[in-house]
């Protein structure tokens, strides 16, 4: 993957095709690069990460956390939780930000995404 799939970047999150077999716009490699980029450009030391139950989520969450960790970020793995739980963690736990691996309101099982916040700000 040389370029970011720009059409997946929305106003408040990242969403796109993410099949459980690792194909689509949002691949495990994309998630790893996203973790590395967030660690590099946001300058956070700790991140909370939650996830939903879509087929593609385990690989995306694992690679996102690996990218964050390999860049020096301490990751608090919240497990399978709601998006609200990740936001609550950002407000109440000693973390600099959070990421929820979810396609949010999209009903298609072939899609997934990332909702991110930095402190109390959605990014």
Regions found by a protein language model. Name each.
Residues 1-64, 70-71:
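An N-terminal, well-structured beta->alpha segment
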Residues 39, 45-119:
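Ferredoxin-reductase
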Residues 121-123:
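Conserved small/polar residues in nucleotide/adenosyl-binding loops
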């Amino acid at each position: 993957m040389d370029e970011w799939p720009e059409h997946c970047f929305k106003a408040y999150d990242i969403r796109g095709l993410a099949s459980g077999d690792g194909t689509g716009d949002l691949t495990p490699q994309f998630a790893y690069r996203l973790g590395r980029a967030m660690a590099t450009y946001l300058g956070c030391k700790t991140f909370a990460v939650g996830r939903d139950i879509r087929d593609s989520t385990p690989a995306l969450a694992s690679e996102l956390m690996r990218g964050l960790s390999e860049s020096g970020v301490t990751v608090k793995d919240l497990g399978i939780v709601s998006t609200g739980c990740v936001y609550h963690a950002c407000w109440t736990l000693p973390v600099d930000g959070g990421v929820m691996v979810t396609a949010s309101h999209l009903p298609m099982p072939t899609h997934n995404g990332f909702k991110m916040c930095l402190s109390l700000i959605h990014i």
